[in-house]
Design a protein with these regions (language model features):
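Cleavable N-terminal export/targeting peptides
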Residues: 1-27
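Outer-membrane beta-barrel initiation region
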Residues: 25-62
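Transmembrane beta-strand segments that form the barrel wall of outer-membrane beta-barrel proteins
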Residues: 32-44, 74-86, 158-164
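Outer-membrane beta-barrel translocator/channel fold
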Residues: 39-40, 111-143, 147
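Solvent-exposed loop/turn segments connecting transmembrane beta-strands
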Residues: 44-52, 82-93, 104-106, 168-174
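Outer-membrane beta-barrel "beta-signal"
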Residues: 56-58, 175-187
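Residue-level signature of outer-membrane beta-barrel architecture
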Residues: 60-64, 84, 99-103, 148-150, ...
Length: 187
């Protein structure tokens, strides 16, 4: 587990370093976000219990020239992220498209995300483990966020994400709903 975590951190660091270099030349990486989240909030219990906070998240949002021609309002951006669990649950990487809508006058925004997710159970599960099934190890991810823009290009963001498995993990609907808070930095 620690070895995989170390590899994930090194990989994300290398991506971050190369992306910052690319950003300086092409402005392909206009925003980086990081934060913490509580997993499985749809299972009941106290949402504000600090023991539920068991994940760390990093997300990179990219700028693609001319992609916003498809959006009447807001900003469309591809994203790439990873969530690491410190409680022995699945970690996962995800990618997809973010649609951010800024309020006209106020420094607030809302965002919707949709895409795919690859869970660590895909790599560390037994060959016959249902966690390796398509839709379980690799599946869908949707998220919704609300944020406040802070000075100097920073923002604070509250996020709810849902990772459905459509019953492919061998158990009826092992879907996961997580809530978190992140700090974003625009360049």
């Amino acid at each position: 587990m620690r070895n995989r975590l170390a590899r994930l951190i090194v990989t994300l660091s290398l991506l971050l370093c190369s992306a910052v270099t690319a950003q300086a030349q092409f402005n392909l990486l206009p925003e980086i976000r990081g934060g913490i989240s509580a997993r499985g909030v749809d299972g009941g219990g106290n949402l504000f219990d600090p023991n539920r906070i068991s994940d760390a998240n990093v997300e990179l949002l990219f700028a693609v020239p001319d992609i916003n021609k498809w959006s009447i309002i807001g900003e469309l951006r591809p994203h790439l992220g990873a969530t690491v669990s410190f409680s022995g649950q699945d970690s996962y990487a995800y990618t997809g498209l973010s649609w951010t809508i800024q309020a006209p006058v106020l420094p607030v925004f809302v965002e919707a995300q949709a895409g795919g997710v690859a869970r660590s159970s895909l790599l560390n599960g037994n060959q016959t483990d249902p966690a390796r099934n398509f839709g379980c190890g690799i599946g869908a991810r949707v998220a919704a966020s609300a944020g406040v823009n802070l000075p100097l290009g920073a923002s604070i963001i509250a996020t709810v994400e849902h990772l459905p498995d459509f019953g492919t993990c061998g158990t009826p609907q092992r879907a996961n709903t997580n809530v978190g808070v992140r700090l974003g930095f625009r360049f």
